[in-house]
Amino acid sequence: GEVMRKLLYTVALFVIASACSTKSESKPYNWEDDLYQRLLTDFCMTESQVKDYIRKYIPDVTDEQMRQWEASKALECMMLDGEKRYFRNAGPNLFRVDSTCYDIKIAKEGTSPSGSEKVNMENLPEIISAVKKEGKAIVAPKRMRVTYTLTVDTNAVPAGKIIRCWLPYPRQDQARQQDVKFISASEPQYTFSSPECRHSTLYMEKRAVEGEPTVFSETFEFTANGEWHNLKPEDVQPYDTTTALYKEYTAEREKHIVFSPRLRELAAKLTAGETNPYLKAKRIFRWVNDNFPWASAREYSTIENIPEYVLDNRHGDCGQVSLLFITLCRISGIPAHFQSGFMMHPRASVSYTHLRA
């Protein structure tokens, strides 16, 4: 999961590409040129650099091993300008994706839960217990105060140019988050997006100053709740397949939610003999969860079809495996859609992608 990072990365990449270009500003936009620059940015490592990382755990790594990992797609690389270039996180990903390499790294460094995992070990049982006790799905409120800051590097944008900035802001039409309170923004003039917009944002703009970074920030509060639906198979009622809502969320949506013959066959295999939508979704979820380890992802726009990419490469980040799950659910007649937002933990937050089926 990395949606907000990808958004900021895309903006930064566009700024860098524009600033570094020596061609006429009047040249029309060309996706192929843009794609090429994005690939160069993502695939920026040489073989010797990747080997240096691998040697931290496998000191005697061989060329033969490198070729084997490349063939298995555990080590991600591609040819650009006639040169083999490796994904910027190819080394770390190898030790997440390849089971033997994973075991070697764990043997050397051990395992310890992250800060968010430690919080979840306490918070998730609290939510489940509260749902069972109170008999409702939304429980355990926590008041959050958030300061979000975005900094554009010094001279990344020519002095005098206006920088337009959209920062995330809590939606107010979601039952699990309430009492949103705006406190402050870095600029005297700002605009909130309409409640009808798909994304909730606060918009500001500022003129770039030579020799100085451009800083945008906002502060707000809201109450976040835990949410858990203790579903049973018998709770699921037949779908009304005639509604616009059902049709929208069981339809193909190019270019990533495509019902290819390969995915249709896979969905049929995973759900064979099952008629209950909840149990179908559970089968699909368990298969995706058990077979595709998390790995840092290249930019989504450079991938032709993300679910097929996940199948081919046998790994994905949270958004990529979500798209595989969504596509398999929709093929199976189960409504599903993509969502993104923030995991909020004490003194930290993480941009994250998830889904709803």
Predicted features by range, described:
Residues 1-3:
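Short, Lys/Arg-enriched N-terminal segments with co-localized hydrophobic residues
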Residues 5-10:
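Sec-dependent signal peptide recognition
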Residues 18-19:
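C-terminal motif of bacterial Sec signal peptides marking the signal peptidase cleavage site
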Residues 32-229:
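Intrinsically disordered, low-complexity N-terminal segments that are enriched in acidic
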Residues 165, 284, 313-343:
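Cysteine-centered nucleophilic/redox motifs
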Residues 194-312:
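Acidic low-complexity segments
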Residues 343-351:
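Beta-rich nucleic-acid/ligand-interaction surfaces
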Residues 353-357:
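Conserved small/polar residues in nucleotide/adenosyl-binding loops
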